Amino acid sequence: MACRPRSPPRHQSRCDGDASPPSPARWSLGRKRRADGRRWRPEDAEEAEHRGAERRPESFTTPEGPKPRSRCSDWASAVEEDEMRTRVNKEMARYKRKLLINDFGRERKSSSGSSDSKESMSTVPADFETDESVLMRRQKQINYGKNTIAYDRYIKEVPRHLRQPGIHPKTPNKFKKYSRRSWDQQIKLWKVALHFWDPPAEEGCDLQEIHPVDLESAESSSEPQTSSQDDFDVYSGTPTKVRHMDSQVEDEFDLEACLTEPLRDFSAMS
């Protein structure tokens, strides 16, 4: 049986006859082509992605959301914000349920005790903060204060059942209505009080002693009071490094003793 001679490659014959480019390889035949029939290039994909990003609207809607939501360029911060919003809403519902249970128990104790008397459910108090943006901002400030070595040492050395009001620092209640100035002051005093549990300074480190601050006055009022202002007068500096300023001068200059002291002969000493 005679073997049939193989024909020369197609692209070789074309190259010999004319200057047309060779046919593409088999693996490149499945590539996507543009609308005009040309092949895709890497720079074409980047241009298309850039044009698609420019055409994206600034906001979008979802079936679950009642209003449009703005797009976020940083996905990590968006996820963190959503987790914090979910946590704040859960804590707010738990705190509201706790208030209702406590008020319901007080009403039952103060009622006449008759079976036909109907007790009305207590409503949420007027000083209850329900603004989600305010609660999230306060939660961020609390998280910033708790993410410290001093707070870790504090919760380890002083368990919750051993903490005494007025002696140990208490986290400000973010669900109570406070002015922005009053809340920031409470957070600052709370952070200053936590510095009492800072790790001990190493030898050779010139750090001054940190004294605890009483937070009872700042936490019980919605506006800044004189006692809180006195604390600020005594303590000055940033929350990370607070120094105790002594108002009295230890060594006072005595003018009379200086005048009566005999003059020294500095030339003889030299």
Swiss-Prot record:
<dbReference type="GO" id="GO:0071204">
    <property type="term" value="C:histone pre-mRNA 3'end processing complex"/>
</dbReference>
<dbReference type="GO" id="GO:0005829">
    <property type="term" value="C:cytosol"/>
</dbReference>
<dbReference type="GO" id="GO:0005730">
    <property type="term" value="C:nucleolus"/>
</dbReference>
<comment type="similarity">
    <text>Belongs to the SLBP family.</text>
</comment>
<keyword id="KW-0597">Phosphoprotein</keyword>
<dbReference type="GO" id="GO:0006398">
    <property type="term" value="P:mRNA 3'-end processing by stem-loop binding and cleavage"/>
</dbReference>
<feature type="compositionally biased region" description="Low complexity">
    <location>
        <begin position="218"/>
        <end position="228"/>
    </location>
</feature>
<feature type="region of interest" description="Disordered">
    <location>
        <begin position="215"/>
        <end position="241"/>
    </location>
</feature>
<dbReference type="GO" id="GO:0051028">
    <property type="term" value="P:mRNA transport"/>
</dbReference>
<comment type="subunit">
    <text>Monomer. SLBP/pre-mRNA complex interacts with ZNF473. Interacts with the Importin alpha/Importin beta receptor, LSM1, MIF4GD, TNPO3 and UPF1. Interaction with LSM1 occurs when histone mRNA is being rapidly degraded during the S phase. Found in a ternary complex with ERI1 and the stem-loop structure of the 3' end of histone mRNA. Associates with polyribosomes. Identified in a histone pre-mRNA complex, at least composed of ERI1, LSM11, SLBP, SNRPB, SYNCRIP and YBX1. Binds in a cooperative manner with ERI1 to the mature 3'-end of histone mRNAs.</text>
</comment>
<dbReference type="GO" id="GO:0003729">
    <property type="term" value="F:mRNA binding"/>
</dbReference>
<keyword id="KW-0539">Nucleus</keyword>
<keyword id="KW-0694">RNA-binding</keyword>
<dbReference type="GO" id="GO:0003723">
    <property type="term" value="F:RNA binding"/>
</dbReference>
<feature type="compositionally biased region" description="Basic and acidic residues">
    <location>
        <begin position="84"/>
        <end position="94"/>
    </location>
</feature>
<feature type="modified residue" description="Phosphothreonine; by CK2">
    <location>
        <position position="61"/>
    </location>
</feature>
<feature type="modified residue" description="Phosphoserine">
    <location>
        <position position="182"/>
    </location>
</feature>
<feature type="modified residue" description="Phosphoserine">
    <location>
        <position position="59"/>
    </location>
</feature>
<dbReference type="GO" id="GO:0071208">
    <property type="term" value="F:histone pre-mRNA DCP binding"/>
</dbReference>
<feature type="cross-link" description="Glycyl lysine isopeptide (Lys-Gly) (interchain with G-Cter in SUMO2)">
    <location>
        <position position="98"/>
    </location>
</feature>
<keyword id="KW-0687">Ribonucleoprotein</keyword>
<feature type="region of interest" description="RNA-binding">
    <location>
        <begin position="129"/>
        <end position="198"/>
    </location>
</feature>
<protein>
    <recommendedName>
        <fullName>Histone RNA hairpin-binding protein</fullName>
    </recommendedName>
</protein>
<dbReference type="GO" id="GO:0005737">
    <property type="term" value="C:cytoplasm"/>
</dbReference>
<feature type="modified residue" description="Phosphoserine">
    <location>
        <position position="20"/>
    </location>
</feature>
<keyword id="KW-0963">Cytoplasm</keyword>
<feature type="compositionally biased region" description="Basic and acidic residues">
    <location>
        <begin position="37"/>
        <end position="58"/>
    </location>
</feature>
<dbReference type="Pfam" id="PF15247">
    <property type="entry name" value="SLBP_RNA_bind"/>
</dbReference>
<keyword id="KW-1017">Isopeptide bond</keyword>
<comment type="function">
    <text>RNA-binding protein involved in the histone pre-mRNA processing. Binds the stem-loop structure of replication-dependent histone pre-mRNAs and contributes to efficient 3'-end processing by stabilizing the complex between histone pre-mRNA and U7 small nuclear ribonucleoprotein (snRNP), via the histone downstream element (HDE). Plays an important role in targeting mature histone mRNA from the nucleus to the cytoplasm and to the translation machinery. Stabilizes mature histone mRNA and could be involved in cell-cycle regulation of histone gene expression.</text>
</comment>
<feature type="short sequence motif" description="Nuclear localization signal NLS1">
    <location>
        <begin position="31"/>
        <end position="34"/>
    </location>
</feature>
<keyword id="KW-0832">Ubl conjugation</keyword>
<feature type="region of interest" description="Disordered">
    <location>
        <begin position="1"/>
        <end position="132"/>
    </location>
</feature>
<feature type="short sequence motif" description="Nuclear localization signal NLS2">
    <location>
        <begin position="96"/>
        <end position="99"/>
    </location>
</feature>
<feature type="modified residue" description="Phosphoserine">
    <location>
        <position position="23"/>
    </location>
</feature>
<feature type="modified residue" description="Phosphothreonine; by CDK1">
    <location>
        <position position="62"/>
    </location>
</feature>
<feature type="modified residue" description="Phosphothreonine">
    <location>
        <position position="171"/>
    </location>
</feature>
<keyword id="KW-0507">mRNA processing</keyword>
<dbReference type="GO" id="GO:0005654">
    <property type="term" value="C:nucleoplasm"/>
</dbReference>
<dbReference type="GO" id="GO:0005634">
    <property type="term" value="C:nucleus"/>
</dbReference>
<dbReference type="GO" id="GO:0042802">
    <property type="term" value="F:identical protein binding"/>
</dbReference>
<dbReference type="InterPro" id="IPR026502">
    <property type="entry name" value="SLBP1/SLBP2"/>
</dbReference>
